[in-house]
Amino acid sequence: MKRTYQPHKTPKKRTHGFRVRMKSKNGRKVINARRAKGRKRLAV
């Protein structure tokens, strides 16, 4: 059986990347929450 997770950089960036997050108000909320928490990586 084929494994379910077959990583690819482009689709990952397109859905979870920093620029995508910044597009919407809720995405910016995510980034700000991660900043406040002190995350090293804000987005993928």
UniProtKB/Swiss-Prot annotation:
This is Large ribosomal subunit protein bL34. Keywords: Ribonucleoprotein, Ribosomal protein. One of its GO terms (molecular function) is structural constituent of ribosome. Disulfide bonds: none annotated. HAMAP family: Ribosomal_bL34 (MF_00391). The keyword rRNA-binding does not apply. Belongs to the bacterial ribosomal protein bL34 family. PANTHER family: LARGE RIBOSOMAL SUBUNIT PROTEIN BL34M (PTHR14503:SF4), MITOCHONDRIAL RIBOSOMAL PROTEIN 34 FAMILY MEMBER (PTHR14503). It comes from Campylobacter lari (strain RM2100 / D67 / ATCC BAA-1060). GO terms for cellular component: ribonucleoprotein complex; ribosome. GO terms for biological process: translation. It holds the Pfam family Ribosomal_L34.
